[in-house]
Amino acid sequence: MESSTEGAPYRQLKAWAESRDLAVLIYKLCFRRAKTIDRGLADQIRRAAISIPSNIAEGNGRGTNRDSLRFLYIARGSLCELESQIDVCLRAGLIEAGDSRNVTDQMALVGRLIGGLISYRKSRPD
């Protein structure tokens, strides 16, 4: 059976695809580091990570650029939250520099893509 979201327009957005990949990286990292990252922090990290593609998708499903922008700003805020949490984990020795580098590179890419999408949406009339 084909998913009703298989052809959803948000799936065409590179920002969504890369943020989904970031969320997968984060989930895998939290699973691998389950013994070093406490449960509460891991839950918060996962929530911030999954919020990014979720808000991009929801915003893209809205009818106006204004609505879409609101959700893109929320996605960008969640990305900032995630960046802060990963930085704390690295400085506390809860994750290794190699893990952090992969995630940091992906977060930077997602940030650029969200910024580009925000600029595009701002330039479009409702």
Each predicted region: which residue ranges?
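Amphipathic alpha-helical assembly/interaction segments
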Residues: 1-126
